Amino acid sequence: MTATPSSKAWIKPALAAVLIAGAGAVAYFSLNQRASAPEITFVSIKGEKISPESLRGKVVMVNFWATSCTTCVGEMPKMVDTYNKYKAQGLEFVAVAMSYDPPNYVVNYAETRQLPFKVALDVTGDAAKAYGNVAMTPTTFVIGKDGKILKRYLGEPDFPALHKLLEKSLQG
């Protein structure tokens, strides 16, 4: 017995429904399974090691930036204000200068602006690689107390939304 065209008519819609449901499930689980922050140790401009262990249990902002990046320089006062607003609640902040940024420029910038948070040099580019091959600056990560990445901002963050996220994370 051969199948007639009408008896196979249900196969394509059923297959499409199964594929759509599968794609939806994958999207749901991937969006709800946050990635862990990389286990990388930063080295500050003062030679201090900033280890993953020292950041555990804290809400952390990791900001990849460069002194040659106008958006980075423009957002830095707002980053300072954000840090100052939430540091008493336990916010940690690491500003990571990109590998192409001359260390003396970074040190000069941090000292003349009196940046109140840790400033690290990514001389080898390993930190940028570990955080998903960061190439665009600024790129900012918000990491929860559980060590999971809560949000990644490309470009200057929406600061009111960032502040809401920080408040929620610092309370939790």
Regions found by a protein language model. Give the residues of each.
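N-terminal targeting signals for export/organelle localization
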Residues: M1-V43, G172
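Thiol/disulfide oxidoreductase modules built on the thioredoxin-like
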Residues: N108-P116, V123-E167
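Short loop/turn microsegments at loop-to-beta-strand junctions
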Residues: A37-P38, V60, T137-P138
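Structural microenvironment flanking redox-active thiols in thiol-disulfide oxidoreductases
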Residues: V73-R113, V123-A130
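C-type cytochrome heme c attachment motif
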Residues: T67-G74, M136
